[in-house]
């Protein structure tokens, strides 16, 4: 098991909060991740894409600290705080609880922070509803708000738009972009919606069989042969979710061994 080590020295604003170097993960003798390098940087949205079984969720769980590594190194900045929103969240039907009470269980927020997060995530009208009655999109907003109440420096989101219609997906990604700018946190996302990935991300990592096949700015990754082999070059119609100049997508896509 590879130990987690603190990042040494004083942190600059653009220094990585988490760094993975040559990380490998195995389950039952089977290789899940191999030679993965990643830097989680404040203010950057990094999106993990790949087919089912490529290792995306395992990599996100390594970032969060829920999965141990078999090789490589994981560094974390002192006092790094991670807000994790899993893809699946089940509510015990025998334990009725309102969204307000569920959010309050985070235990970190003062009144000012509570009001700020509730306003930013638009969950005011949901607070007194039982969790069991919330839709998938509403539940994800509550989970995101609860994560933000914990003052995270890193937000880790596993398929946050899964099961949502196009309008709800667009609204959620706009919200994530706004929160990144407002709170300055790093964001690591798993997504299968390639239109939104290209519009919302600063960096895209494309995984295949547990390795990073290519990485870089979205517009350059889509031209990379490894990406096109997996997904083709066509993204489908423009969603109109973000303006085309939302990010500067210039710069080369790197092969998997490049710097994270």
Swiss-Prot record:
It is found in: Cell inner membrane. GO terms for cellular component: plasma membrane. It holds the Pfam family ABC_tran. Part of the ABC transporter complex ZnuABC involved in zinc import. Responsible for energy coupling to the transport system. Keywords: ATP-binding, Cell inner membrane, Cell membrane, Ion transport, Membrane, Nucleotide-binding, Translocase, Transport, Zinc, Zinc transport. InterPro entries: AAA+_ATPase, ABC_transporter-like_ATP-bd, ABC_transporter-like_CS, Metal_Ion_Import_ABC, P-loop_NTPase. It is a peripheral membrane protein. This is Zinc import ATP-binding protein ZnuC.
């Amino acid at each position: 098991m590879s130990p987690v080590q603190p990042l040494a020295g004083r942190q600059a604003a653009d220094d990585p909060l988490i760094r993975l170097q040559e990380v490998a993960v195995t389950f039952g003798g089977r290789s899940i991740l191999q030679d993965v390098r990643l830097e989680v940087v404040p203010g950057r949205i990094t999106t993990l894409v790949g087919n089912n079984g490529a290792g995306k969720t395992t990599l996100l769980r390594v970032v969060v600290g829920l999965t141990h590594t078999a090789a490589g190194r994981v560094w974390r900045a002192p006092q790094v705080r991670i807000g994790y929103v899993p893809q699946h969240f089940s509510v015990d039907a025998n334990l009725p609880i309102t969204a307000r009470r569920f959010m309050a269980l985070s235990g970190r927020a003062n009144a000012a922070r509570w009001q700020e997060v509730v306003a930013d995530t638009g969950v005011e009208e949901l607070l007194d509803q039982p969790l069991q009655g919330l839709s998938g999109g509403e539940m994800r907003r509550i989970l995101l708000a609860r994560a933000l109440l914990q003052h995270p420096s890193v937000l880790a989101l596993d398929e946050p738009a899964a099961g949502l219609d196009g309008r709800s997906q667009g609204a959620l990604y706009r919200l994530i972009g706004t929160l990144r700018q407002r709170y300055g946190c790093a964001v690591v996302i798993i997504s299968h919606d390639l239109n939104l990935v290209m519009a919302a991300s600063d960096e895209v990592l494309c995984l295949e069989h547990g390795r990073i096949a290519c990485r870089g700015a979205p517009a350059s990754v889509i031209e990379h042969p490894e990406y096109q082999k997996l997904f083709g070059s066509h993204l489908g119609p423009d969603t109109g979710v973000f303006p085309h100049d939302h990010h500067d997508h210039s710069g080369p896509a790197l092969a998997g061994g490049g710097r994270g």
